[in-house]
Amino acid sequence: ADYNTAYFAPFTYEDSMYGFPALTGGTCTVVIYDKAMWKEAGYDQFPSTWEDVEKASEYFNGKGITTVAFGNGGKWQANSDFLSTLGNRYTGPDWFMSLVAKNGAAFTDDTFVSALTEMQRLFTDTKIFNEDFNVVTNEDAREYYISGDAAAFIGGNWDESYIWAALKDADEEKFNNMGFAVLPQPADATQAPNSQNIGLGYAVAINSKLADDPEKLAAAIDLAE
């Protein structure tokens, strides 16, 4: 089979698998941007570095437009939709796997602290994001993009699906100008600039109590499949 066995990693412990991945695609961190708005700002595509995004914010702020909309009102979005990717740009995948395996990596390591420092800088020392980012949710922030009050939005693939559906019939021009990009690279990050996170937090597991009831076990497996 062509099934990627790496998908089992989050649900494997000491060579035993405890769940079958139910979500193996999509991303928690996608940049959705209005190509026409960024073209007017002098960019043919969304910038690949935060330095250029910060430069672009001078133009958008002058127009009364938020450069990038983001919502952390639920207090999970900053980690899932931003730091998970930004952190990897500093630490790399080996650090993460070492952390999972409890093999030496720690959140106090210099590379991860650097990621936290950069994230704090981006949200508090620049004017890239909406001022209420820590109050509004991702659902609120994506409306800033839909309404044209923001030139870009960062969220998950579920947000992309919502924006796609909202604009498809309501605003054909804006729908056709939707662009997608990976999270920009920080100036002092040394790991892969195009790295991306993926949602692997869900799995289907069979109740071990069904082992003594073949009929129910077969039904559960059939349902899971």
Feature names for model-found ranges:
Residues 1-12, 36-48, 143-144, 151-152, ...:
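Extracytoplasmic "Venus flytrap"/periplasmic binding protein-like
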Residues 64-67, 147-155:
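Alpha-to-beta junction loops
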